Amino acid sequence: MTAPTAAVLLIGDELLSGRTRDINLQQIAQYLEPLGIPVMECRTVPDIQGEIVAAVNALRARYTYVFTTGGIGPTHDDITADAIAAAFGVGISEHPDAIRDMAARYGAMNTEFTPARRRMARVPHGASLVANPVSGAPGFRMENVFTLAGVPQIARAMLEDIGPRLKTGAVVCKVTVKGRGLREGDLAVRLGEIAAAAPGVSVGSYPWYRSSDDHGVALVARSVDAGALAAVRSQLEALAASFGVKPEIEV
């Protein structure tokens, strides 16, 4: 059985201009990792339909799942739903369940359900809805493409409705060995040897520097094989200790 994979497509001019800092990639990847679904690629595209269509079609052909964020709000530049419909070659219209739920929600708030708000009930033909417990306007699923809101709080809430629909893979275990005061260049040769001897384990090094008194290297190992991971962990701890550093462990 082929292990499932995922890609994330971030949509929005505000991301590319630097006005908005993305955190959706991080939270999607963190949600999927315990399910055994690694994020293999991330792209960011502007609010241009042709760019969105091209990216969606490229990613959905390559990966098990694609998660898009952004562009499903009530304004003129929220064009993601139209772009997804174009990518799949289908029409788009208001979903009756979305209209019903949103009308009830706005009615309960004594807020007018305006034409602009109704735009958020439009989904490609054949799509199923993704629940939005935060603001009510749904996301949707079109085959292997899940379309989420750009607001991080809403996107994260939508993942809870998506999770049960996903085909999961082998759970990846992870261990982090932190060495304060270590320098990445001093570790490079030995770290490469450890990684080469354990092909079933992904080994990486991530330096940090917060101040002259708070810096070092985090050595991170990941694997679906708990035994192989334990062996690499021991070697990473020994590597840190060989420089007179007491390793700090995070699992």
PLM regions and their residue ranges:
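N-terminal small/polar loop signature for handling phosphorylated ligands or for N-terminal nucleophile
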Residues: 26-79, 84-86, 107
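An accessory alpha-helical subdomain
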Residues: 144-239
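Glycine-rich phosphate/diphosphate-binding loop of Rossmann-like nucleotide-binding domains
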Residues: 2-42, 46-47, 230-234
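Short beta->alpha linker loops
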Residues: 44-47, 97, 118, 182
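Proline/glycine-rich low-complexity loops and linkers
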Residues: 51-57, 78-169
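Glycine-rich beta-strand-to-loop/alpha-helix junction loops that act as flexible
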Residues: 11-13, 68-76, 150, 206, ...
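Structural motif
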Residues: 7, 64-65, 121, 128, ...
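Conserved short beta-strand edge segments in small beta-sheet-based binding/regulatory domains
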Residues: 239-251
